[in-house]
């Protein structure tokens, strides 16, 4: 039955042919068009139309003869109002004679399988023929069926069907969906062109064909630069969110599905894309081929040429760019074949293989004949033989030889492979020194199918030289770069360089290279060679570097470009790159060598990252870039690994960092083999190097997140690891998209993790990840939300480690970003020692990494010390005198010196489009300053700098053939130019009296320069169609420009000692009205000639695309203020240009996305915004800025405030002799032009009385024909004894004015006095009872030309409401404080300090203002400001209009609610009342609107950011103490002195004399405490030989160096030493002593029983004592002088006891009895090992069996299962340890040892598995000690005995007999195996080890 059915199908297949009558010929009319446009902006199209007649004469059933006649073409560039398919009247048709020759069509089962053409027919013509014939490819019988459930197969009885088949057309061998249905007569009547030769009674069938590009076996396309788009298949129906592609054919046939005639066939191919990948307005490439039958005539012979050649099926064939010989496409070695290609192909037949072999042989044997044809073809192209260089001819010859060798190799090596000939046809891979043969791109196919200048008389080297000269000329006027299309010229240069051979590049170099480093033409050529990314370019770059044509920095910059720019990283490319990096001459240039290593490592990663390589390189045209098993990458990693070990041995720290980063850049799992011994502490490395190893796993985390996640999690979970490594692991772990279960484990662990740095990192990471919005991170966001409520709720200081993830999506624009900002907190500084930043932008579904920054340093404090003065010999703090200088003697405990880590650091950043990495150590910093010192004197002479950098921020291209067989392409380039042209000299005074030393910052610095800085970027988006026969590129383009141009003359004088700065600036340049900035957009269509080197936008045919008539707006500003007239010109086609337009454009954007997508617009249209200087209207041309800062410390008491006000009024009145309002408290001067600004600042400092006064004077003067001056003088006085502050501000404005107009001078004099009491700050109860209400008094006087013109007086009260006070009592902090006070009279613990601070905050503000004679301008500006406030607070504001009353008065009331979460405000004016209700407050705004007499607004903001470490505080309260790191413990002090704080500076490993440093030191700063009667505390301080004693009696008395001080509440007592302020002391209202030591940055409050000490963060990690270690971790606070960490607070206190009663040794016994726990880090297995799954084989003891029978059975089964599990485990972990061997099974049971009397199945159920061998710690008891084996040893399990033994020497750890040894002995007997592996080895003993165990 089945045989009969198959026979029927075969008969049907044979007869299912188009009804070709051999006696007739068929005449078809061919009409085709291909257009490109930004069609959703405007119906303006550019493109080509073609028409012809196709005559087909059948010869046999398998062969047709055909000819195209009357072939004509025409191009258009105009608007088509009705769209691309409207009828177009064309008058200038041109002949296309290359298509006139007859050809043959070979059929197989009715399908076109080959087209034979004349051998001289160019390849582009063949593709056009195939495009026309593709419309006639019809499969009505469902051959090559693609199985689908919805298929309805055709049959002879019906004319309808739905099915999918695989079919070959010009655009690919793809799945094609057929929809077949009868076509009724009515549509034919309406559209007779569908079937012109059909009759009314004919059976007409309509066939709709839809090509599915997402399911293709062969798909001609080329692409690059598409990395970052997940799940992309270039050329498919949809690519990302930016491009969609479709191809639909409508075929109308008459007859039946068995025999039919094609009446008409129309194929329409459309590509719709976003020009910038994100736009809602799209662009279009459309092509259509319409073949309609015109006549069926009597057959007339169509003579075929005699020299026909096969061109294959209808698939588009690639051109040969570098040879006029038709391209013979290679079938690549299977190692280069894409997996998708080989997997989708079927096995080849032997006949195909033989045919391939014959073709190869025949091509080789006809070389001479083809050489003759080549000569003829050159003449046919109207070029002589001389036009083809010898280099090109030799290249073609070598290419043919290579093809022959390749084919022979494949035929011989792969003849047995079923897939050898089924792989995709690929372009030939470029030979060494030859450019790639990239298909479909204009400069490779634009000249009659060849490279643009292959057949041209123009030499590419000469053309490149000409472009370099043009660019050089353009750069002379950088402000006009956009108009001159310099960026387009740069891209043309790059494209031409891509087509050039190595010899051509060498010639171009000889023509362009200049010995001058400032030749801009050479610089442009230099950068474009690196941007071209070809093998010849790399060879040329290598020559430049080795021959030192480039400086080291230039060479490094170009090498860093290569991973981004390379277009085909083939094995030959890697070989050349590797040869360059390994060259000795390059290794002698460290910066070049290190950058080259990093770039090469990055390139290895990019090629081996399957998704990146597939999307970024033209793999569908060339196959894989490197073979599947490319050993060069492994060899490179092995080389880096060896270099790492060697550098570790040499101690070359910068080199170590470079190698670690290079290993990380590879992103290969094999790097773990080299990092593992260091990460697991099996080999020595510094903690910083281990940290760098972890952060270098960032690439691995992206490429292999599962593997990286396992490693990073193992680092994180080890609480014995360094916190920096653990935090870095958390940061990278979040980049691996961890699942919800893992995040929940981390969140739960944060509740028990003892390290706060790590807890903070986990908290911030999970909380921020829960708010991610970017679609690619929705799974992470969901997982984080599942864990966020499990987190430790503790609030963390931002000084701790943080990992902040944020994202945003602008949905309607398909734009977004993901930002990861993280830092790892430092233990020795508030500044983080590691900062990581990764910022990705998303556009159209493509992710692009814009920022990849990291900054790491081993020790922030060590770095700051090195930067202060690396060469100057500083006083060694160890040489200072002993700290206690009075007559007492104390036994100060010796403190073991902590050794600071060696200074190491690095920075990685993306600079000028490239990733750069800089590493350093202390020697590098010293060398940096030596170089600075050496360069200081030469820089005093005038120097010239004229440099430029050109780079391409983004390069993207995708191209494929359209329905006409012509290349269609979409490209984006973003060329960027950064130019600096400067002449400068530096005037330095940086040497001290000692000629051998320098200062980091000179005391005086001067600079004189004339500089022109230019930044110009152009985004170039192009949608184009290439017609190779006339070298035209029909395009629609979008270009956006950003230009910033600053030509300026700058003189700077800086005096550090006098704190003065002066700047003189003047715009320079030869251009009139110099342009400063420009932002523009241009859209246009054009038909561009490829071989004419000219920017497309400059074509005569270039037509701008206009949406609507442009509007011009021009405004000049600044003329009346500064005298410099700035012109703002706006030309735009936007419909609206107002605030609503701005709001709509910013809709959906947060601040980050607004900056990241600054030029992204929702609509596309032409606009131009230009900012320039109008020199004709400007009256000034230079500006001088002068600034001076001054400060003063006064001895002022509280009563001075009244005296200051009254005396000030008198002095003001006497000096001015003019009437002033009573509110005016300050008069600037009668003649400001005479009084020097320095004198005025000094006067302000004297009048703004306070303990601390800060002053600032700034003057901005514009000079020219009419001067303009603006003077600001301000002073702020602050009190040390209360919260009062006083401010004076004077602002004098004298704008520019015409010569015939009197100058107008306006003066604003402001005074403000805030009077605040001194509140209780160490007693919460007193704070609740205290009245903190404060007063504000302020006034503003305005003078115009020295005459009063208005004044304003404000009086106000700042209050605390009774409701707020009552609410504070019930807050958690207040309740906790009350409990602490009740339990131990403790007032200074953290909860009480927080409660006291809340009790001093004010929640009510009442202001009354009176004003008169204010100018209308000031009133109008005030109202405008109010309208802005009203706009942004619209939901909260209400207005009530009232009758005018109380004119000249204004009342402002502000009330904050009790929780500080919202405020109400009201403003009452004469005309209206305005009310704001429930304006929400966050913690930052709350700090601003709730003033407090205890601190300033800046203090409150800083405390919100750094609640723990803004003012690090240590407290000794009555019965409890709190450390700097917030550890609270019970406190009991004896009468002996205890060390409260001891400054303990670390010694650096970099110090040369480290070996000479003693193990203990006596520090220069120490604070001692002891208890006297009534739990009072006496304090003794040593501050660099200044001894301060605090002695509590009835009140605390203070002695300084034995002298008793008189301390008052109303003023400070200042202690000076050597002209420096050492101490400031005063009493608080509670009579407690308040002391500040500004030089030592210490603050202390002492009330007799309690001591509060605040120290700056400069003491971090360098103190010891009762205040803890101050390293950020409470777990280390109880560190003793011997660096042991205790758990008992009493023992900890005793460890810092300084002696006392010699008879009382109980405290010492208590201290010594405590176990010493060191701060050493522990290591764990970070990277999984090959371990057997059997627990017993891993050293665990399993439960004993119940009976012998089950034991025997389980032993047998376990033996086999252990072996299999071991092997499977080995396989599962093979990606972690490729070079490791799996552990063998420890089971020695044979398979014959099975159970007796019980079935195997039941034994598995009743007994657990058992092994014959166990691992246990061996114990050897001796006379005085017990010894334990350091590792568990094998021994026979119960019921087993040794069959044989071996003697081995085993390491033992021994303990003296006693409690400890007995404890461990008991544990071993219980079956526990203690870990003695890290203990000290005491002896080796020879013991018997069982070799095999057998049953008893």
Swiss-Prot record:
Compositional bias ranges of the Low complexity kind: 335-354, 1750-1794
Ranges of biased composition (kind: Polar residues): 1805-1815
Segment forming the signal sequence: 1-16
Localization, UniProt: Secreted
Record bears the keyword Protein biosynthesis: no
Glycan attachment residues as annotated in the record: 155, 212, 290, 593, 631, 684, 852, 981, 989-990, 1168, 1282, 1394, 1413, 1420, 1464, 1526, 1720, 1747, 1778-1779
Keywords: Disulfide bond, Glycoprotein, Secreted, Signal, Storage protein
InterPro entries referenced in this protein's UniProt entry, alphabetically: Lipid_transp_b-sht_shell, Lipovitellin_superhlx_dom, Vitellinogen_b-sht_N, Vitellinogen_open_b-sht, Vitellogenin/Apolipophorin, Vitellogenin_N, VWF_type-D
Family annotation (PROSITE patterns): VITELLOGENIN (PS51211), VWFD (PS51233)
Entry-linked Pfam families: Vit_open_b-sht (PF09172), Vitellogenin_N (PF01347), VWD (PF00094)
SMART domains: DUF1943, LPD_N, VWD
SS bonds (residue pairs): 1514-1667
GO cellular component labels: extracellular region
Domain Vitellogenin: start-end pairs: 20-835
Domain VWFD, first and last residues per copy: 1512-1705
Composition bias type Basic and acidic residues, residue spans: 325-334, 355-370
Protein name: Vitellogenin-1
């Amino acid at each position: 039955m089945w045989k009969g059915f198959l026979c029927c199908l075969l008969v049907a297949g044979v007869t299912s042919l188009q009804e070709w009558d051999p006696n007739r010929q068929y005449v078809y009319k061919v009409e085709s068009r291909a257009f490109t446009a930004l069609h959703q902006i405007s119906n303006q199209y550019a493109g080509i139309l073609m028409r012809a007649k196709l005559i087909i004469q059948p010869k046999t059933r398998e062969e047709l003869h055909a000819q195209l006649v009357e072939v004509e073409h025409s191009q258009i560039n105009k608007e088509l109002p009705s769209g691309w398919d409207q009828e177009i009247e064309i008058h200038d048709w041109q002949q296309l004679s290359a298509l006139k020759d007859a050809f043959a069509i070979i059929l197989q089962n009715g399908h076109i399988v080959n087209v034979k053409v004349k051998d001289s027919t160019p390849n582009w013509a063949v593709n056009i023929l195939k495009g026309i014939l593709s419309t006639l490819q019809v499969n009505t019988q469902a051959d090559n069926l693609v199985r689908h459930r919805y298929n309805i197969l055709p049959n002879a009885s019906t004319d309808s069907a739905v099915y999918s088949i695989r079919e070959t057309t010009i655009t690919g061998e793809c799945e094609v969906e057929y929809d077949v249905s009868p076509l009724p007569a009515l549509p034919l009547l309406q559209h007779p062109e569908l079937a012109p030769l059909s009759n009314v009674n004919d059976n007409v069938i309509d066939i709709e064909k839809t090509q599915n590009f997402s399911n293709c076996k062969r798909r001609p396309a080329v692409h690059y630069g598409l990395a970052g788009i997940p799940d992309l298949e270039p050329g498919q129906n949809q690519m990302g969110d930016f491009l969609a592609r479709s191809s639909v054919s409508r075929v109308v046939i008459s007859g039946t599905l068995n025999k039919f005639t094609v009446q008409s066939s129309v194929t329409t191919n459309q590509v719709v894309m976003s020009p910038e990948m994100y736009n809602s307005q799209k662009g279009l490439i459309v092509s259509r081929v319409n073949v309609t039958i015109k006549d069926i005539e009597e057959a007339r012979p169509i003579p075929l040429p005699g020299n026909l050649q096969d061109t294959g099926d209808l698939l588009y064939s690639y051109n040969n760019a570098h040879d006029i010989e038709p391209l013979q496409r290679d079938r690549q070695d299977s190692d280069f074949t894409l997996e998708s290609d080989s997997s989708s192909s079927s096995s080849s037949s032997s006949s195909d293989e033989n045919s391939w072999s014959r073709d190869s042989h025949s091509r080789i044997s006809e070389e001479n004949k083809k050489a003759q044809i080549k000569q003829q073809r050159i003449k046919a192209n109207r070029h002589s033989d001389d036009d083809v260089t010898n280099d090109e001819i030799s290249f073609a010859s070598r290419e043919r030889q290579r093809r022959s060798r390749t084919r022979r190799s494949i035929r011989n090596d792969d003849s047995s492979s079923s897939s050898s000939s089924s792989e995709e046809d690929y372009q030939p891979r470029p030979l060494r020194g030859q450019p790639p043969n990239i298909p479909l791109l204009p400069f490779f196919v634009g000249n009659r199918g060849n490279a643009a200048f292959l057949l041209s008389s123009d030499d590419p080297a000469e053309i490149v030289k000409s472009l370099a000269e043009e660019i050089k000329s353009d750069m002379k006027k950088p402000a006009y770069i956009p108009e001159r299309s310099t960026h387009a010229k740069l891209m043309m240069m790059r494209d031409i360089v891509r087509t050039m051979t190595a010899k051509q590049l060498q010639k171009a170099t000889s023509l362009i290279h200049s010995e001058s480093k400032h030749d801009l033409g050479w610089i442009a050529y230099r950068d474009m060679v690196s941007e071209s990314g070809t093998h010849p370019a790399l060879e040329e770059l290598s020559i430049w570097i080795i021959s030192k044509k480039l400086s080291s920095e230039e060479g490094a910059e170009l090498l860093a470009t290569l991973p981004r720019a390379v277009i085909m990283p083939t094995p030959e490319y890697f070989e050349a790159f590797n040869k360059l990096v390994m060259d000795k001459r390059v290794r002698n240039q460290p910066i070049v060598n290190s950058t080259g290593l990093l770039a090469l490592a990055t390139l290895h990663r990019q090629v081996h990252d399957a998704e990146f390589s597939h999307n970024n390189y033209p793999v569908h045209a060339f196959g894989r870039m490197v073979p599947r098993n490319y050993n060069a990458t492994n060899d490179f990693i092995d080389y880096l690994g060896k270099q790492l070990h060697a550098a570790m041995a040499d101690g070359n720290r910068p080199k170590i960092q470079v190698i670690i980063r290079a290993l990380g850049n590879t992103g290969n799992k094999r790097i773990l083999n080299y990092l593992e011994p260091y990460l697991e502490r099996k080999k020595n490395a510094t903690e910083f190097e281990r940290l760098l190893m972890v952060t270098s796993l960032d690439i691995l985390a992206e490429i292999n997140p599962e593997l990286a996640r396992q490693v990073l999690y193992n680092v994180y979970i080890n609480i014995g690891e360094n916190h920096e490594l653990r935090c870095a692991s958390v940061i990278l772990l979040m980049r691996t998209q961890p699942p919800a279960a893992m995040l929940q484990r981390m969140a739960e662990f944060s509740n028990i993790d003892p390290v706060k740095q790590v807890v903070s990192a986990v908290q911030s990471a999970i909380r921020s990840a829960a708010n991610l919005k970017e679609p690619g991170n929705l799974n992470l966001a969901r997982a984080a939300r599942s864990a966020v409520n499990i987190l430790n709720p503790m609030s963390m200081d931002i000084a701790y480690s943080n990992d902040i993830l944020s994202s945003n999506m602008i949905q309607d624009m398909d734009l977004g970003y993901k930002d990861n900002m993280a830092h790892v907190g430092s233990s020795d500084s508030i500044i983080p020692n590691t900062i990581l930043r990764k910022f990705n932008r998303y556009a159209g579904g493509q992710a692009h990494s814009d920022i990849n920054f990291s900054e790491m340093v081993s020790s922030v404090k060590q770095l700051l010390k090195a930067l202060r003065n690396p060469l100057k010999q500083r006083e060694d703090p160890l040489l200072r005198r002993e700290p206690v200088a009075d007559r007492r003697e104390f036994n100060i405990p010796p403190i073991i010196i902590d050794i600071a880590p060696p200074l190491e650091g690095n920075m990685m950043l993306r600079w000028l489009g490239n990733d750069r990495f800089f590493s350093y150590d202390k020697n590098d910093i010293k060398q940096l300053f030596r170089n600075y010192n050496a360069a200081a004197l030469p820089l005093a002479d005038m120097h010239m700098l004229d440099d430029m950098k050109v780079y391409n921020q983004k390069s993207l291209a995708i191209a494929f053939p359209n329905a006409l067989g012509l290349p269609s392409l979409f490209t984006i380039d973003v060329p960027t130019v950064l130019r600096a042209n400067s002449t400068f000299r530096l005037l330095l005074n940086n040497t001290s009296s000692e000629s051998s030393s320098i200062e980091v910052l000179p005391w005086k610095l001067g600079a004189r320069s004339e500089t022109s800085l230019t930044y110009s970027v152009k985004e170039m988006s192009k949608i184009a169609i290439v017609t190779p026969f006339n070298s035209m590129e029909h395009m629609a383009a979008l270009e956006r420009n950003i230009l910033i141009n600053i030509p300026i003359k700058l003189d700077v004088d800086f005096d550090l000692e006098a704190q003065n700065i002066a700047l003189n600036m003047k715009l320079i340049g030869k251009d009139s009205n110099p342009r400063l900035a420009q932002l523009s957009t241009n859209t246009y269509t054009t038909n561009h000639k490829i071989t004419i080197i000219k920017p497309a936008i400059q074509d005569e045919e270039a037509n701008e695309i206009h949406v609507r008539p442009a509007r011009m707006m021009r405004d000049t500003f600044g003329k009346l203020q500064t005298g410099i007239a700035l012109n703002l010109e706006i030309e735009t086609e936007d419909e609206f240009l107002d605030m609503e337009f701005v709001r709509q454009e910013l809709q959906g954007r947060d601040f980050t996305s607004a900056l990241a997508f600054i030029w992204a617009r929702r609509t596309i249209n032409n606009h131009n915004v230009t900012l320039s200087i109008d020199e004709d209207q400007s009256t000034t041309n230079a500006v001088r800025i002068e600034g001076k800062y001054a400060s003063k410390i006064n001895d002022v008491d509280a009563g001075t405030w009244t005296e200051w006000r009254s005396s000030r009024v008198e002095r003001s009145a006497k000096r001015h002799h003019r009437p002033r309002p009573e509110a005016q408290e300050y008069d600037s001067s009668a003649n400001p032009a005479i009084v020097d600004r320095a004198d005025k600042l000094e006067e302000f400092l004297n009048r703004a009385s306070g303990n601390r006064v800060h002053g600032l004077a700034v003057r901005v003067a514009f000079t020219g024909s009419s001067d303009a001056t603006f003077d600001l003088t301000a002073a702020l006085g602050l009190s040390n004894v209360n919260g009062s502050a006083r401010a004076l501000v004077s602002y004098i404005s004298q704008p520019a004015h015409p010569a015939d107009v009197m100058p107008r001078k306006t003066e604003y004099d402001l005074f403000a006095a805030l009077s605040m009491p001194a509140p209780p700050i160490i007693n919460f109860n007193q704070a609740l009872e205290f009245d903190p209400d404060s007063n504000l008094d302020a006034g503003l006087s305005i003078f115009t030309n020295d005459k009063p013109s208005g004044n304003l007086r404000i009086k106000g009260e700042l209050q605390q409401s009774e409701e707020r006070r009552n609410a504070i009592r019930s807050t958690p902090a207040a309740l906790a404080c009350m409990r602490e006070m009740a339990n131990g009279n403790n007032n200074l613990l953290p909860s009480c300090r927080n409660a006291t601070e809340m009790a001093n905050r004010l929640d009510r503000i009442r202001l009354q203002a009176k004003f008169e004679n204010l100018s209308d301008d000031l009133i109008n500006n005030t109202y405008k400001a109010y309208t802005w406030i009203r706009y942004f607070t619209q939901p909260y504001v209400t207005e009530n209009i009232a009758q005018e009353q109380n004119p000249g008065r204004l009342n402002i009331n502000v009330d904050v609610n009790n929780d500080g979460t919202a405020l109400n405000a009201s403003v009452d004016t004469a005309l209206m009342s305005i009310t704001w209700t429930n304006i929400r407050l966050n913690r930052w705004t709350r700090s601003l609107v709730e003033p407090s007499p205890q601190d300033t607004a800046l203090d409150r903001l800083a405390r919100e950011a750094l609640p723990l470490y803004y003012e690090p505080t240590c407290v000794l309260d009555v019965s409890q103490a709190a450390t700097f790191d917030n550890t609270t413990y019970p406190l009991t002090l004896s009468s002996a002195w205890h060390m409260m704080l001891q400054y303990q500076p670390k010694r650096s490993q970099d110090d040369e004399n480290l070996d000479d440093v003693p193990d203990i030191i006596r520090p220069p700063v120490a604070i001692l405490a002891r208890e006297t009667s009534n739990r009072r505390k006496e304090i003794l301080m040593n501050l660099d030989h200044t001894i301060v004693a605090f002695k509590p009696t009835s009140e605390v008395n203070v002695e300084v160096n034995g002298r008793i001080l008189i301390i008052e509440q109303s003023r400070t007592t200042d202690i000076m030493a050597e002209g420096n302020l050492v101490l400031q002391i005063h009493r608080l209202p509670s009579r407690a002593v308040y002391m500040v030591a500004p030089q030592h940055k210490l603050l202390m409050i002492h009330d007799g029983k309690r001591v509060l000490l605040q120290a700056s963060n400069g003491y971090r990690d360098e103190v010891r004592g009762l205040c803890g270690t101050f390293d950020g971790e409470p777990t280390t606070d109880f560190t003793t002088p011997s660096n042991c960490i205790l758990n008992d607070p009493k023992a900890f206190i005793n460890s810092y006891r300084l002696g006392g009663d010699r008879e009382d040794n109980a405290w010492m016994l208590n201290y010594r009895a405590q176990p010493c726990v060191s701060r050493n880090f522990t290591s764990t297995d970070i990277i999984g090992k090959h371990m057997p799954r059997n627990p017993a084989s891993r050293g665990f003891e399993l439960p004993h069996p119940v009976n012998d029978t089950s034991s025997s059975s389980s032993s047998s089964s376990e033996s086999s299962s252990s072996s299999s599990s071991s092997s499977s485990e080995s396989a599962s972990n093979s990606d972690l340890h490729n070079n490791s061997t799996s552990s063998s099974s420890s089971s020695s049971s044979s398979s014959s040892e099975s159970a007796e009397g019980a079935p195997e199945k039941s034994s598995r159920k009743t007994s657990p598995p058992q092994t014959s061998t166990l691992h246990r710690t061996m114990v050897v008891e001796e006379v005085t000690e017990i010894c334990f084996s350091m590792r568990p040893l094998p021994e026979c399990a119960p019921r087993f005995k040794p069959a044989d033994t071996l003697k081995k020497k085993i390491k033992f750890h021994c303990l003296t007999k006693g409690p400890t040894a007995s404890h461990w002995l008991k544990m071993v007997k219980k079956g526990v195996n203690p870990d003695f592996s890290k203990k000290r080895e005491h002896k080796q003993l020879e013991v018997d080890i069982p070799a095999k165990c057998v049953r008893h």
